[in-house]
């Protein structure tokens, strides 16, 4: 009995040791799995920390006192024109490099909420003062260019069309650099940019693909947070092979671009002491060929009273080469009289259409207010009066060029 018990003892010890070892292995495996889960969670959190997202949206309601067509308005309430939503994402590749993408969907009739990539670029900080970027970038022609679609960043319901509408292109595909020089109490920034861009027919008012090559320019900006001064120059070569056309109408002859040179000059300034705000820009755009050369300017005065910011804006634009187009109309008219035919009548009609669309003089007076009634949301109201068309149609429907033309706008802007 005793001998048998002693013979079984090594076996019992071995089994106990085996069970203990097995339990220890399971425990170790569980601990290892737990560590892996913790590492995976940390990795996911680390990747998530590299992403940042924000967005912006505008709901725009506008009504014209007649169908003058300013800002695509009609004599009925419309919510599509000027309404949009945008999303912007940034991924931190490393401590000095990031990738940025911005998509915008606009409600206007032509785009009908189709998402469009406005920004898509890599940004690299070479030094604390020098940043280089490459990809699809905003064309930095104006003071509000970086916030062109972000209505919440603007005091009024919209940027002045007479100035910002003088250039149809808003982005370029290429590269730029931004170099900041820190002074005692202010900063001077130098920006240079190069690239090219195609304006597709789907975004063109007259349904014609237009190519912009050899885009190049520079910006100098000085600010001390109260005062800001800015100057910009840009140039490009414009080409297209399709004559302008609108639905159910024949194309307008001689409206293509054959490597025509375009230039842009601009100066701007802003004063903001926390309550009183003054913003102004003066620009000149020149384009070879049939397209108009335009001088334009605006001044916005605003004053903040708690959550309310009433403002007044005066804007003016004037094409400076009307005589060239008017003379072309006269030549085509004489030719039509001397050689009456369908072809000469078509040529005269095209010349007259170019003159009617490209000869523009207009002054717009706008008064409105902004109400920041909730965090990150602003309600705005605006009344704009169009006048001083001179001998032109003022860029509105020719049937109403001699009428009082007014646009009423109510808008909600938000960021998130």
What are these regions (language model features)?
Residues 73-74, 112, 120-124, 145-147, ...:
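Outer-membrane beta-barrel pore domains
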Residues 2-70, 350, 411, 416:
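N-terminal periplasmic/intermembrane-space "pro-region" immediately following the signal or transit peptide
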Residues 22, 107-108, 287:
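Short strand->helix junction
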Residues 38, 83, 116, 171, ...:
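Residues that act as N-cap/strand-start positions at coil-to-secondary-structure junctions
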Residues 196-207, 211-212, 245-250:
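Active-site-proximal beta-alpha loop/turn segments in soluble metabolic enzymes
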Residues 47-68, 74-200, 212-216, 220-228, ...:
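Outer membrane beta-barrel
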Residues 35, 189, 201-206, 232, ...:
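A short secondary-structure junction signal
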Residues 33, 40, 102, 118, ...:
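Acidic-residue sensor for enzyme active/binding pockets
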